[in-house]
Amino acid sequence: MNSILIVDDTAFTRHVLRNMFESLGLHVIAEADSGEEAVRNYCLYKPSLVTMDITMPGMNGLTASRKIMELDKDAKIIICSAVSRHDTVIKAIQAGARDFIAKPLQLERIEWAVQKVLGTGVNVRQGDRQGKQIAEVLV
């Protein structure tokens, strides 16, 4: 089963992402609220996928992504950030991100990115009514 590490300094955003992933039938193995914790949790849990915010106290998401990629060149990282300027997206890809999702988050966009990054064989079911309601919440 594919496992996901959610990294965001905002508890509400982590909660929304967890609910989105669970509504898609995916397993959230851990959460982190900083880049440092993201790197530690990546080493501890070896998740199939990491969703990473950029702007966090301490180590930011771009630096954490680079460190994770140094540890595992095959790591799969999706950046989820409100900072979506063109240069930021380029920096995210250069740091190793496989996709970039601009906030506010939408269930359909999350589902598409997960399928793209993890591969077409991923068992992602259509979001249920509750999942779609959660996806409408602005993050």
Write out the residue ranges for each language-model feature.
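C-terminal output helix
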Residues: 87, 105-114
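Acidic catalytic/metal-coordinating carboxylates
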Residues: 34-37, 60-63
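Active-site beta3 strand of CheY-like receiver
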Residues: 45-51
